[in-house]
Amino acid sequence: MHTVFPKEELNQRLLNVRSQMAHANVDGIVITVPENIYYLTELDHLGFFACHLLVVPKEGEMILVCRAMEKITFENQVKNARFFGHADNEDPADYIVSALSELKLLNSRVGIEKNSLFLTAKLAESIQAKTPKVEWQDTSNLVSALRIVKSPLEMDYVRKAAKATDAGMLAAINSIHDGASDYEVSAECSRAMISAGSEHFAFGPFIRPTSRLGEEHTTWRGEVFKKGDAIF
């Protein structure tokens, strides 16, 4: 089983979330932010670009709604929630309704993370239309606020991530010279970070010559560094 944090830490996180749910006076919440889903379940993969919604009741087992093809990943990684998998030609909202029904939340006050890049307007409208008796509340910051305070084990991982980042930065700096391509530099940066224990990168790396210095979010393009270049 893939695991980073012990069961006790995950249990404490869930207790903290439920405490905040009580303060918000909601009977359940629907989590749509991938980082928040990971925070409670440890589901760690790249399928989060598609629908992922975690239903958290005030008591009882959580339910994750996502694509059916993610079942094996879910079973390998998640031990504290149930899996409701939908086919790609089905409306995920129907599975959210089933999850809410299973957890007896169809006549309740339920929070949802509205301020999420991963909840489309179409899906939100479909969920709302199919749950006329649910009183929906915006709980966008409920879980995110708890994540700000790190546990000792989380801090250890932050330090490990910083060391991997340092390794990548130093490798990039050392590989830059007149005539080097940003392909070479980016490859050395990535190699060093992965060798230092990094998993897949959340962003970047961003390595740019003078000609693209002001482009905030562009990566390597096959350009060649020249003597005197300012480099990001």
State what each model feature region is.
Residues P34, K114-S116, T210-R212:
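Acidic, glycine-rich active-site loops and adjacent beta-strand->loop/helix elements
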Residues E9, L14, Q20, D91-F201:
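Flexible, acidic/His-enriched mid-domain "rim/lid" segments that flank
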Residues D27, S108, D229:
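Conserved acidic residues
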Residues L64, F83, W136, F206-I207:
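Generic preference for hydrophobic
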Residues I37-F48, S140-A145, V149, A180-F232:
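Short catalytic-site patches enriched in acidic/histidine residues
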Residues M1-S98, K163, A167, R221-E223:
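N-terminal accessory/capping or targeting/presequence segment of soluble
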Residues V56-E61, P132, P209-S211, K226:
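Short acidic-glycine loop/turn motifs at beta-strand connectors
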